[in-house]
Amino acid sequence: SKLSKRKNPTSINYYRHMGYMPEAVVNYLGRMGWSMPDESEKFGLQDMLDQFDLRAVHLGGPVFDTEKLDWLNGRWIRENLDEQAFANRVAEWAINRDNLARMIPLIKERVEKFSDIAPLLGFMFSGMPKLDTSHFEHKKLDNETVRRILQYSSWRLDGLRHWSRDGLYEELNQLAQGMELKLKDFLSPLFVAVAGSSSAPPLFDAMAILGPDMVRARIRSALEASGGVSKKQLKAWDKDYRLLSAARTEHPE
């Protein structure tokens, strides 16, 4: 697929959170529309600068292949990191002290021993939760409503300029009211989308810490896992969402 927000997250922060090595990402982007004279697939930035020739740039539209990026990142990990370097990179990626300090208040009252932390915060360090339609079953929400919640939330969060706990609460609470749903029911699919489970630390705090790139990507992934949206549905839902947004503008609280 082409590199688009609909199918591939375009923010570099997403790929950092997913655990890609910066060297591998630069390597992969360098290969999009250009190749080394010897056709080697793995190369560093300095190698690329030394060998770059504008005449060798391909005119066709580049295709972003995440499986290829995974393969290339794996090569960088295996071929360029010894055990100590590997440990250092993992620690740098996973144990961000600032983020850890923000997470502690969310789980401290629920922890009786340190080994309890992993199940509570595992979703903060993982990629896309592996979900299917069964994860979104809810006694008060049918599948279409679940998918509308995810799609409308995706649209609303795409337009959110200031990413904060209070801002997220305000926007999603207003959206729940516009859809005439209780906030608890409305948030259920979002818990699953963001954390992979309906049992997780406070959602808005977790979303604020995860950041916009990862949260938006997980919601889009969850929408596909819950059944996706047809073109006909998307057109109808877009019209309904615009009406909800217009009503909010006309009658702000």
Can you annotate each of these PLM segments?
Residues 1-77, 188, 192-194, 198, ...:
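Alpha-helical recognition segments enriched in aromatics with Gly/Pro capping
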Residues 17, 74-78, 95, 112, ...:
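Amphipathic alpha-helical interaction elements
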Residues 29, 73, 104-111, 124, ...:
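Short alpha-helical scaffolding segments that buttress acidic/His motifs in well-ordered protein cores
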Residues 34-38, 57-58, 78-82, 99, ...:
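Intrinsically disordered or highly flexible coil/loop and linker segments, enriched in small
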Residues 82-179, 183, 241:
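Small-residue-rich helix-loop
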Residues 166-236:
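Charged substrate- and nucleic-acid-binding regions of tRNA-handling and nucleotidyl-transfer enzymes
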Residues 245-253:
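Mixed-charge, low-complexity intrinsically disordered regions
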